[in-house]
């Protein structure tokens, strides 16, 4: 009889398994399940008793992967609690839903307010179909960093320089960065993008990066500090940016994690997953969506930039 090969865990299951390795996370999730905190949604495809019983055991990653197979809502709850996407108000991110995670974050909350304020939403004026297109953040002088694929929506190369694109009516598309755009906060902090200085070539060996020049003024937030050392696996990080609704993703899981609130500044904590050999990027497990393109990946301990988020797959792997 031919021996069947064991099923390989999906990226979603591997992500959940990684999260459940964190100190105290498994026990706290089991406690929440035992208290019935998940029982009000019947579509979890697992009863609260089943979830609590499973999480209360010390099992292998393979057992976790098997348990969460096809249990989309069970998986979404693990990510909702342990990889939340926290709202930001006046530069301060909300309290995390898990006590252990909140304990790790709260001692850095005040210090992280400054770098959080230096991340903004890139907005478009006179674009044919879009009001905004991604995230950008300030570095030294009057420079804004974003992704190549974001900048290419409003700018293009012309010889050795770059110019703003024209819309269908022949009018130049203009761009600005708003460092606020927070949930239910009416204030704005808008600054005009004067020039596009550089867009990386669209080749695999080049980073997905672009450099913009903002009109310099005294009211600009302080520049972010770039980390001097490479990130390390399992280093605590957070993606700061503006996740947008993405119709390509599972609507139910997306609503569970993002709370049906999009287009505003969010703080998404997580960890560095890996640093591929000889690559210019890292992978992380923070919860992100399309509008996060161009987001800053910040070290939670020091607030320095360890990466530029440029892509990934919802509930799977992200790149920076």
Where would I find each of the regions flagged by the language model?
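Protease-domain processing segments flanking chymotrypsin-fold serine proteases, especially trypsin-like
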Residues: 1-134, 264-269
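C-terminal subregion of chymotrypsin/trypsin-like serine protease catalytic domains
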Residues: 2-26, 30-35, 39, 274-280, ...
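Phenylalanine-focused residue identity feature
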Residues: 67-68, 73, 93, 101, ...
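Short, solvent-exposed coil/turn linker segments
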Residues: 101-105, 231, 295
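Serine endopeptidase catalytic core focused on the charge-relay Asp
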Residues: 111-126, 130-133, 137-141, 145-290, ...
């Amino acid at each position: 009889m031919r021996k069947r090969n064991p099923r390989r865990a999906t990226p979603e299951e591997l992500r959940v398994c990684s999260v459940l390795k964190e100190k105290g996370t498994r026990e706290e999730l089991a406690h929440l399940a035992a208290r019935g905190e998940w029982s009000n949604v019947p579509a979890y495809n697992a009863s609260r008793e089943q979830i609590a019983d499973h999480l209360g055991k010390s099992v292998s990653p393979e057992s976790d992967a098997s348990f969460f197979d096809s249990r989309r809502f069970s998986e979404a709850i693990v990510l909702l609690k342990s990889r939340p996407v926290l709202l930001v108000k006046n530069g301060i991110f909300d309290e995390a839903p898990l006590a252990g995670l909140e304990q790790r974050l709260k001692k850095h909350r005040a210090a992280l307010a400054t770098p959080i304020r230096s991340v903004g939403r890139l907005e478009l004026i006179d674009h044919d179909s879009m009001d905004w297109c991604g995230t950008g953040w300030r570095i030294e002088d009057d420079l804004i960093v974003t992704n190549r694929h974001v900048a290419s929506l409003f700018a293009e190369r012309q010889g050795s320089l770059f110019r703003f694109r024209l819309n269908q009516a022949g009018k130049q598309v203009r761009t600005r960065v708003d460092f606020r755009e927070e949930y239910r906060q009416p204030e704005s902090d808008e600054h005009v993008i004067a020039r596009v200085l550089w867009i990386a070539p669209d080749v695999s060996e080049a980073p997905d990066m672009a450099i913009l020049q903002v009109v310099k003024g005294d009211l600009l937030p302080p520049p972010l500090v770039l980390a001097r050392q490479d990130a390390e696996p399992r280093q605590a990080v957070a993606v700061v940016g503006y996740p947008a609704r993405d119709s390509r993703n599972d609507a139910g899981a997306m609503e569970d994690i993002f709370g049906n609130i999009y287009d505003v500044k969010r703080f998404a904590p997580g960890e560095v997953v890996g640093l591929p050999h000889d690559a210019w990027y890292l992978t992380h497990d923070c919860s992100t969506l399309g509008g996060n393109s161009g987001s800053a990946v910040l070290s939670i301990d020091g607030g320095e930039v360890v990466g530029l988020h440029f892509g990934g797959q919802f509930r799977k792997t992200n790149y920076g």
